[in-house]
Amino acid sequence: MSDFDFTQRFLFDDTDVRGELADLRGSYAEVLAKHPYPEPVAQLLGEMLAAAALLVGTLKFDGLLVLQARSPGPIPLLMVECSSEREVRGIARYHAEQVEPGAGLRELMPEGLLTLTIDPRRGQRYQGIVELRGESLADCLSGYFADSEQLPTRFWLNADGRRARGLLLQQLPADRLKDAEARTLNWEHLVTLADTLTAEELLGLDNETLLRRLYHQEAVRLFEPLPLRFRCSCSRERSANALSSLGQADAEQLLRERDGLVVVDCQFCNQRYEFDATDIAQLFAGGGSGAPSATRH
């Protein structure tokens, strides 16, 4: 069992189907350590972390991928970001009194919308939206790919507060199998086998054992794992830029309202950035991010 977070790609040698497995423990623990989430919220957030990791392993881009779910229900917001450098962070907002033990996606995020955003460093920003109408986040993501007429893609996701795991299957353009009926039958066969996967197996088995148990009659080629890690992209410079964007008059007014100390908290990691009168003055005197001030988690 690996001691780092990773995704791992695999191929079915005789078909036009690829797969990806995601395993997050350290980064999942980092996300949960920042906020005290109830178990159902932590589970959904873990599934979204695994989904983002799978998508970054599947989609080719240089920039940032954002998965965001919004709802008027007990969980108004789930949000995960994963960069092409394979750095992940996530957050949830919830109404504690409305979160029932054992509740699933339908109960926690009724009438919800799931947004997938790819924000490349160069080129056009892409955004797709799908209703959260499935029984699970995996169902919703699979439905998104079906509705958007992309390559047939299926997801299996589970998380238990300690480990977040995901499996993805994707049908590639015709190469090895040219016959349309044969391609369809092969795809349905592989998906049907994956549908037998239990949460206990996905969360408890290593990748080699899992694939052998599912596809012992198939020729599966497993590639080297690629690491993932938790990292928040917040910084003192970004916080200073946000204050600068207010304009000098508004920033100084905010400073007076806050008794001489403006505090900017990162919603993802709880890092605190403090700006006093000297810092604010330097912001508007070309001083960049201001003089050093105390920061804390």
Swiss-Prot record:
- GO function term, MF aspect, one: protein folding chaperone
Q: Which domain of life is it from?
A: Bacteria
GO CC annotation, single:
cytoplasm
Under SUPFAM superfamilies, the record lists: Hsp33 domain (SSF64397), HSP33 redox switch-like (SSF118352)
Q: How is it modified after translation?
A: Under oxidizing conditions two disulfide bonds are formed involving the reactive cysteines. Under reducing conditions zinc is bound to the reactive cysteines and the protein is inactive.
Instruction: List all disulphide bridges recorded for this chain.
Output: 232-234, 266-269
Q: Where in the cell is it found?
A: Cytoplasm
Q: Which UniProt keywords apply?
A: Chaperone, Cytoplasm, Disulfide bond, Redox-active center, Zinc
One GO process term, biological-process aspect = protein refolding
Name the family the entry cites.
Belongs to the HSP33 family.
User: Which PANTHER family does the record associate with it?
Assistant: 33 KDA CHAPERONIN
What is the role of this chain? Redox regulated molecular chaperone. Protects both thermally unfolding and oxidatively damaged proteins from irreversible aggregation. Plays an important role in the bacterial defense system toward oxidative stress.
Q: What is this protein called?
A: 33 kDa chaperonin
State the organism of origin. Azotobacter vinelandii (strain DJ / ATCC BAA-1303)
